[in-house]
């Protein structure tokens, strides 16, 4: 560990295999001082795509994993940290996408950058967010949707809680969550808080052999935006295509970002329920359509973003999205 800390401090990059080995040491027997020194040195140097992928592999190695018997699993987990207090976009979008027939293995945690994270809002609507891995696996196989709470599936992360809190700055662990789905999702929509992270995370996903993914940053949001342009890196096998999309490209209209503001877990839970049942419309519904449509598209169920949006709309209007919320609550 000391050798790796010295190398990173000197500005040397680690290989993917070395980063994986370092992550294993961090989780198993590194001291808090060593962990803090390593994370600080990596932050100062700047983490490479290979290092990020290697750390993700090490985190996956230490995780409690599941393998649901479902083809084409999709995750909609973002990094958080965009400093906008919006409604719970990725969580609600996952439920709507499931209503459109996309099998969802949703990975998430409590709030990072808003007053209500995926775990906060799902707990508020009545989901058993602390379900054990075998139970979540069964739920995904039966209902086509399940939620995996990060602390339940990644207990080894306890080793880095102290150093991260004491450092008080972003580290590589702030971006690893979306790369470490415990169900080994085949495809995902991954939102990032910084547009500079779009190509970096896309390359990391390619190194991790994801089948298909969209890495997105929407004009300040770690989501696909309806208030402006979204930068996208689409990963397909080893190919990465970068492009931008606007609300109009998806058959939607541009909205004010203030119109998608969130609130407390109780308020966001009410919005989630209202959107999936069709009672909440306007901008809040539109941003869910945009992001659920992306999940439907990346799953291969729709051929374009716009077609995905239309299928998301149909999932809400038919009651299928509300049925998936009921399945998740009743699991």
UniProtKB/Swiss-Prot annotation:
Gene3D superfamilies: Nucleoside phosphorylase/phosphoribosyltransferase catalytic domain, Transferase, Pyrimidine Nucleoside Phosphorylase, Chain C. GO terms for biological process: L-tryptophan biosynthetic process. GO terms for molecular function: anthranilate phosphoribosyltransferase activity; magnesium ion binding. Its cofactor is Mg(2+). 5-phospho-alpha-D-ribose 1-diphosphate binds at residues 78, 81-82, 86, 88-91, 106-114, 118. Pathway: Amino-acid biosynthesis; L-tryptophan biosynthesis; L-tryptophan from chorismate: step 2/5. Anthranilate 1 binds at residues 78, 109. Keywords: Amino-acid biosynthesis, Aromatic amino acid biosynthesis, Glycosyltransferase, Magnesium, Metal-binding, Transferase, Tryptophan biosynthesis. It catalyses: N-(5-phospho-beta-D-ribosyl)anthranilate + diphosphate = 5-phospho-alpha-D-ribose 1-diphosphate + anthranilate. Anthranilate 2 binds at residue 164. Mg(2+) 1 binds at residues 90, 223. Mg(2+) 2 binds at residues 222-223. Its EC number is 2.4.2.18. One of its GO terms (cellular component) is cytosol. Binds 2 magnesium ions per monomer. The keyword Zinc does not apply. Belongs to the anthranilate phosphoribosyltransferase family. Homodimer. NCBIfam families: trpD. Catalyzes the transfer of the phosphoribosyl group of 5-phosphorylribose-1-pyrophosphate (PRPP) to anthranilate to yield N-(5'-phosphoribosyl)-anthranilate (PRA). This is Anthranilate phosphoribosyltransferase. It comes from Haloarcula marismortui (strain ATCC 43049 / DSM 3752 / JCM 8966 / VKM B-1809) (Halobacterium marismortui). The lineage of its organism: Archaea, Methanobacteriati, Methanobacteriota, Stenosarchaea group, Halobacteria.
